[in-house]
Amino acid sequence: MSRAIVDIFSNPFLTNELAFRGGTALHKLYFKVPRRYSEDIDIVQVNAGPIGPILDTIQKTLNPVLGEPRRKQTVGSVTLSYRVESEGPPVVPLRLKVEINTREHFAIMGFQKIPFEVRSRWFNGVCRINTFTLEELLATKLRALYQRRKGRDLFDLWLGLTEAKADPVRIVAIFKQYMEVEGNIIDGISFMKNLGDKMKHLGFISDVKSLLPADVVYDEEFSYNLIRDKILTRIDE
């Protein structure tokens, strides 16, 4: 995955047309070390326009290493799904998904260029990645926490506040702007009920556990209380 990220953002055309977003961006760029497994590279189309040239360039960049992907296109997104084998023993099948948001061509706080480096036995590379501020990445995570039932979103927000020291006031302000763009205004009480209901669902709790290394200690109840107290209580301010 790290090689694919370097390959994409080393390409002059792609780095001007795409911005890195999502959980993988948080763990690769803002957290001290990646804390959970991820097989998704989430990117945003920066400039409105045809997606074809971008897809062609991504495949010319990645296919020589990863092979031919399956392509899926929906309203607002395009996904390239690759299946490969791990480079080191034991060899295991891996999946890498590159998902492009073709709907949101903006950054509330402006796009950021962050250095990224990979050093391994199999690949060395450096690039500057076009991405979002920490708080904007977490604001879109907050939106995901409301809109879907995946405990990894709560985990990422917890890390963002505790380790990366993100500003919860900025997160909420940016979250509100994203929701306003969608035409989907949500109040704090409704969000608290939404998250409280999810905390009772086994699938929400178990979602992140399979993604964590054995040495990572995570308390979802503590995370729930933290996000509620630091973020959700500010939505109505």
Question: Which stretches of residues belong to each language-model region?
Answer:
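Structured mid-to-C-terminal alpha-helical surface segments
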Residues: M1-L18, L29-I41, Q45-E237
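Glycine-rich beta-strand-to-loop/alpha-helix junction loops that act as flexible
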Residues: F20-A25
